[in-house]
Amino acid sequence: MASTSYSANALVTALKKPRDKFTKEDIKKYIFDNGIRHLNFMYAGGDGRLKTLNFVINDADYLDEILSCGERVDGSSLFSYIEASSSDLYVVPKFSSAFMDPFAELPTLCLLCSFFNKDGQPLESSPEYTLHKACEAFKKETGMEFQAMGELEYYVIADDMGEFPAVDQRGYHESAPFAKFNEFRQQCMLYIAQAGGQIKYGHSEVGNFTQDGKLYEQNEIEFLPCPAEDAANQLTIAKWIIRNLGAQLGLDVTFAPKITVGKAGSGLHIHMRIMKDGNNQMLKNGVISETARRAIAGMMKLAPSITAFGNQNPTSYLRLVPHQEAPTNVCWGDRNRSVLVRVPLGWASKTDLCKIANPNEKGTSYDTHQKQTVEMRSPDASANVYLLMAGLCVACRYGLSLKDGLKVAEQTYVNVNIHKKENAKLLSKLDTLPDSCWASADCLAKQRKVYEEFGVFSPAMIDGIMAQLKAFKDKTLRAQVTKSKTAMQKLVKTYFYCG
């Protein structure tokens, strides 16, 4: 059970219970006790952004009605693959998601919602329910739980005042005054935590440059591992908060995968771990486990088509080029940032680091094996987070079912920087990621049956994603725009506020 001690979420503190135990009566009590008159239903549309439906609480009966029944919405305006002739959907609030809107002048309670069809059944093709189905299939087929967390990268843009300039492309973990937006990031982190986000840390990132009188500073907020459905909710809310606070303070914010040539693009790396009975299955005897290697094998197999969920506009493929802090080839390795799937440091040495650093300590007994994850490095924030998490969950389940999974993992493992000249022969043997949305759609077409297995992704949704990717007509676009600064700027402007 999640701890309620020192929670940043106002409802957890007031109700003295974890969010996953909230009931309708709890929500009503908090609203009445705090004199709240406004309620927002929020839900991610097909573009992955949060949509909002506002309510004013007329009386207690009306509050009970909307909490119990939800409300109608036009599904064809939210999802491109829903026909206008039969588009009515229900949105029904999830009480565990409750948080106070940090931007509303009038006290407003927000609730994330699930979609239901006319028959009162979950909408099969909604991204949120697709992720739910993926997690349920994973649990049913493996007896384990799929958990995840994201590293959310973004650029903050403001006028360049010329004071304490940071070194170009050397902004990683920089401090003030060379990093200009630490306070903005801290305020974002607080609001995200108050909305239920479980944050690991935040810091400035590599990207830091000036252009045309503007300062571009890259930042990252990283979360803690949790059930994948919660992880997707947290990332979706986080993007909404970062954008809103930026707008409030007069700062421009972009999650775009690439905003100029030669500078670090922004990714959305996803860390994963597999749990059973509350125990992390990614390590065994201090080394990466067979379970982890099999899950990685699934990602190696499905890597080309995972881009269909994780890299959803043409600028995504301007980021996936060599020497730009982004992967290009299908491989994995330990502590290796040139690979697609990285196994980061996981505190596997069993050394009491705290005692060594602090001689006055008697020793700690923290179970560090719970911390090990594996990281998929190709996605970016153009992704619909729910579909991306669902795709990764499917890939890990698929890997666990492969008879030759361990062999696949062995064949795709590398322990060198694959982009160095001396490793050119090795690089030539590795499969490459798609170079366009068009190519990504082709990869999805070839591998779609894996995603449709167990009814996780609906055929209509796969068709819709492929059509959306093909519509960009970007088969040769990467080669074209890299030769033209004007074409590059036009493309970046088009997708500047993606995701």
Region spans (language model):
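ATP/Mg2+-dependent ligation/transfer catalytic cores
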Residues: 1-208, 226-240, 251, 387-388, ...
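Membrane-targeting and insertion segments and their boundary/processing signals
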Residues: 13, 162, 166, 212, ...
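Active-site capping/gating regions of soluble enzymes
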Residues: 17, 25-32, 37-47, 51-119, ...
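Histidine-centered divalent-metal-coordination microenvironment in nucleic-acid enzymes
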Residues: 112, 151-165, 207-222, 256-278
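Generic beta-structure capping elements
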Residues: 224, 275, 344, 486-488
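Short, local alpha-helical segments
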Residues: 224, 370-376, 419-428
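Eukaryote-specific, cytoplasm-facing alpha-helical/coiled-coil scaffolding segments in long proteins
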Residues: 323-325, 414-422, 466-475
